[in-house]
Amino acid sequence: MLRDVDLTVRAGSVVALLGPNGAGKTTLLRVAAGLLTPTEGRVAIGTDEVTRRRPSQRAREGLCLIPEGRGIFPNLSVRENLLLQVPAWKRGQSVEPALEAFPVLRERLGQTAGSMSGGQQQMLALSRCFLSDPKVVLLDEVSMGLAPRIIDEIFDALLELSRRGVALLLVEQYVSRALHVADHVYLLARGSVTFSGAPTELDESELMRRYLGGDELEASATN
């Protein structure tokens, strides 16, 4: 359950959402994407409120979610996965622009997505997102289980996206990586924001205390 969460992701910024398991990070992404409807509050893309709009409607507004499971179609080819992401009014356009960040996919356009490595599948998920010309990208553990070299490639592509003005909100298991790329950090614990600020405002001891819910543990011990 989320409580009194006020979160802003500005165009071109990279915002990291950190916290222990069960803190509400994935729930927050699902609310933003329209997969869950909040009982209170609002979700907006720019000045356009989208709280009651379906996920497909939010996607047309420029929101793209890359879930932890990557959200690709394993039985379809790479090319078919990409073509499915092309908006109806752009049908017939080339998928080539989506491959610029990950040239390795050019060699695998006819290959089924499920037969590729985990890193290549994540590259495909990102390429699908890039094709939709997103304004906001929500990323849930994009580096999960990937080799360091692949993680570097993926984050290079994401940072290039942010330089083009796309807003990024990421849930990331590697805290040091998240702090390195983020402009702003939110820490969640038990559904509430316990910290909001620049990565440089967090020292390691404070980060670990907040990340592990230290404030709440201390309060419980006092009582």
Identify the function of each model-found stretch:
Residues L18-P20:
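The feature captures the beta-strand-to-loop junction immediately N-terminal to the Walker
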Residues A33:
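Helix-to-loop junction immediately C-terminal to a conserved catalytic motif
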Residues T37, E49-R70, V95, E107-G110, ...:
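ABC ATPase NBD coupling module
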Residues G41-E49, E61, Q93-E100, F195-G197:
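Conserved ABC transporter NBD signature motif
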Residues T112-M116:
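Conserved ABC ATPase signature
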Residues C129-F130:
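ABC ATPase C-loop
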Residues E141-V142:
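Walker B catalytic motif
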